């Protein structure tokens, strides 16, 4: 388990102290894939580097596996870091060493024998799909393969935690998906806790169990990925989700809807469904029961961690009392109802 307690980080700047992190509190259970997302400058990389104390926090505590790293001696901290692997956006491979020897480097530095190194490295290369490339040099393999070398190297010391700092941001979409699939498989097969930093909500959607949204050094939202997608509360979260799933109507369509409502009454709603609600006739049942007009303006169905997720933008019309009853009925069926605007 990872616990970040009242974590703050300040750096000196030209105009005074800059607060990169402010009173961050997070608990990440063992075996979870936990995402941290935010815009550029939100403090994501600073936060992940406090977990292994590459950046020592100004205030607060970092507890990994029951040990408070901020209280350890230099020697004890070096030993604790062996249980925390890390991969980066840039692969940081040694060009003069083969794939095998790059993965073996941490074990060589730890004084392992050649036999122990081979016994550890060969299964790792098989795990990341690089057994056939073990004798090649970094210049002879692709970017995605280089990141796989970085992952295998990070796993060489058999860590319990893997930190990923924008590890896929320099890769094309197809390669990104393959790396994320690999990380999920490593999490599942090795029981590894993974903390993943990204600015892409698509990455969070594909691989993470839970997510924290960071803005200006503060955690502004946290929860299960499916819950955050269903009902985002903070404007930063809504903007990030909007990069993956359209949350609002295009301006031209919104203007036409407003024109249509000028002479009447109406509700512009966002309805979010998950699980079995996606393929149930809830909307048609609502229309029949409450004698409403529902005009579907926009919709899509996606999948988050194997769970179906649907989102609709609808224009609802009818008697005000019945509209209210209909919205209550939808909520009883597990539909998340958000009123985007009300025009009278």
UniProtKB/Swiss-Prot annotation:
A Pfam entry, by short name: NIL
Write out the catalysed reaction: L-methionine(out) + ATP + H2O = L-methionine(in) + ADP + phosphate + H(+); D-methionine(out) + ATP + H2O = D-methionine(in) + ADP + phosphate + H(+)
The UniProt record lists the EC number as 7.4.2.11
Q: Does the keyword Nucleotide-binding apply?
A: yes
Q: Where in the cell is it found?
A: Cell inner membrane
In which broad location class does this protein mainly occur, judging by the first location in its UniProt entry? Answer: membrane
Family statement: Belongs to the ABC transporter superfamily. Methionine importer (TC 3.A.1.24) family.
Chain's role: Part of the ABC transporter complex MetNIQ involved in methionine import. Responsible for energy coupling to the transport system.
Q: How does it assemble?
A: The complex is composed of two ATP-binding proteins (MetN), two transmembrane proteins (MetI) and a solute-binding protein (MetQ).
Annotated protein name in UniProt? Methionine import ATP-binding protein MetN 1
Q: Which species expresses this protein natively?
A: Burkholderia cenocepacia (strain HI2424)
Upper taxonomic lineage? Bacteria, Pseudomonadati, Pseudomonadota, Betaproteobacteria, Burkholderiales
* Gene that encodes the chain: metN1
């Amino acid at each position: 388990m990872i616990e970040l307690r009242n974590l703050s980080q300040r750096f000196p700047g030209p105009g005074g102290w800059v607060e990169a992190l402010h009173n961050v509190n997070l608990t990440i259970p063992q075996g979870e894939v936990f995402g941290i997302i935010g815009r550029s400058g939100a403090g994501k990389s600073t936060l992940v580097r406090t977990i292994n104390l590459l950046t020592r926090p100004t205030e607060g505590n970092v507890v990994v596996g029951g040990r408070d790293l901020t209280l350890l001696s230099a020697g004890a901290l070096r030993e604790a870091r062996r249980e925390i692997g890390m991969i980066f956006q840039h692969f940081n491979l040694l060009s003069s060493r083969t794939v095998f020897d790059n993965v073996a480097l941490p074990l060589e530095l730890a004084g392992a024998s050649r036999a122990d190194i081979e016994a550890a490295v060969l299964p790792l290369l098989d795990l990341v799909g690089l057994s056939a490339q073990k004798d090649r040099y970094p210049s002879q393999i692709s970017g995605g393969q280089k990141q796989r070398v970085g992952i295998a190297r990070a796993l060489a010391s058999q860590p319990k935690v893997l930190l990923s700092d924008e590890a896929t941001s320099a890769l094309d979409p197809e390669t990104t998906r393959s790396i994320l699939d690999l990380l999920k498989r490593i999490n599942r097969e090795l029981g590894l806790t993974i903390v993943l930093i990204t600015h892409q909500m698509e990455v969070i959607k594909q691989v993470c169990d839970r997510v924290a949204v960071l803005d200006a050094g503060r955690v502004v939202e946290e929860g299960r990925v499916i819950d955050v997608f269903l009902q985002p509360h903070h404007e930063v979260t809504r903007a990030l989700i909007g990069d993956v799933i359209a949350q609002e109507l295009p301006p031209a369509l919104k203007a036409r809807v407003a024109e249509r409502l000028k002479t009447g009454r109406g509700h512009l709603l966002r309805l979010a469904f998950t699980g079995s609600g996606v393929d149930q006739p809830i909307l048609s049942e609502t229309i029949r029961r409450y004698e409403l007009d529902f005009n579907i303006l926009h919709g899509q169905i996606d999948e988050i961690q194997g769970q179906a997720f649907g989102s609709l933008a609808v224009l609802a019309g009818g008697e005000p009392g019945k509209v209210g009853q209909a919205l209550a009925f939808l909520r009883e069926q597990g539909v998340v109802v958000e009123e985007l605007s009300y025009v009278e």
